[in-house]
């Protein structure tokens, strides 16, 4: 599957140093779905295809990698907050950590979405300037 960023890039960009997550927790399908849902409607399918082909790699790295990573996190966060196993679907809990309450999860989602949208708007400002991204 062809995506603008790799799972390792998504993890490195969307999660802070204190939040360990193995890159395998995010798949290319997660990234592709986030791109289709949040990025393509804004930049257009034709431009997205050009970016996937490697054109404007600097623009992708500087302006789109972070919002793609954050939108990917928004999409996978609910799945990361629970585990499914032989006992069904459960929230992880240990002596040191407790599952976040619903309000905290909503606030995290809002914060991530706000940051991702702001970064995506910044990319639009960049490509709307007449001297940028000609081809």
Please report, for each region that a protein language model flagged, where it lies by residue.
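Short, glycine/acidic-rich hinge or "gate" loops at secondary-structure transitions
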Residues: 49-53, 85-94
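Short, intrinsically disordered N-terminal pre-domain segments
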Residues: 1-23
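Glycine-centered helix-coil hinge/cap
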Residues: 24-53
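Residue-level detector of conserved catalytic or cofactor/ligand-binding positions
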Residues: 123-133
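Short, charged/polar micro-motifs that form catalytic or ligand-binding hotspots
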Residues: 24, 58-66, 102, 106
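An exposed acidic His-Trp-rich patch
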Residues: 88-118
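Elongated alpha-helical scaffolds
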Residues: 61-89
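Small-residue hotspots
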Residues: 67-70, 74-75, 109, 115-123
């Amino acid at each position: 599957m062809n995506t603008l960023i790799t799972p390792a890039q998504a993890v490195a960009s969307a999660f802070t140093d204190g939040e360990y997550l193995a890159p395998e927790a995010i798949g290319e399908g997660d990234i592709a779905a986030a791109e289709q849902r949040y990025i393509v409607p804004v930049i257009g399918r034709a431009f997205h295809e050009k970016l996937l082909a490697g054109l404007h790699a600097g623009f992708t790295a500087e302006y789109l990698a972070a919002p793609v990573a954050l939108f990917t996190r928004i999409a996978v966060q609910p799945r990361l907050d629970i585990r499914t196993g032989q006992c069904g679907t459960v929230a992880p809990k240990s002596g040191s950590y407790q599952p976040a309450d619903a309000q905290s999860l909503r606030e995290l989602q809002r914060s991530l979405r706000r940051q991702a949208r702001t970064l995506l708007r910044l990319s639009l400002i960049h490509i709307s300037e007449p001297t940028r991204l000609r081809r």
